[in-house]
């Protein structure tokens, strides 16, 4: 999905897939504070703390509570392994 206005977001936990789809902005609960990811973001990995992942699809924000985990961002693909 590189170069587009949407990112592919996948959130999985031990219980299964919590969300799989697209988003145009995502906010994460990082260990050192919340942070946002937008399309064309530089690649990185980050640890997550207990909190809520917020993601926007068009004009609508959705929320997914998590119990920690980590996120990998690369080529507009965001993969979250949540606790």
Question: What are these regions, as identified by a protein language model?
Answer:
Residues 8-83:
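Compact, glycine-rich, soluble single-domain proteins
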Residues 1-6:
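Short, Lys/Arg-enriched N-terminal segments with co-localized hydrophobic residues
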């Amino acid at each position: 999905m590189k170069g587009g206005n949407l990112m592919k977001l996948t959130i999985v936990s031990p219980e299964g897939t919590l969300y799989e789809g697209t988003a145009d902005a995502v906010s994460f609960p990082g260990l050192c504070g919340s942070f946002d990811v937008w399309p064309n973001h530089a690649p990185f990995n980050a640890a997550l703390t207990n909190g809520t992942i917020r993601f926007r699809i068009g004009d609508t924000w959705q929320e997914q509570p998590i119990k920690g985990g980590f996120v990998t961002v690369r080529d507009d693909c965001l993969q979250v392994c949540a606790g």
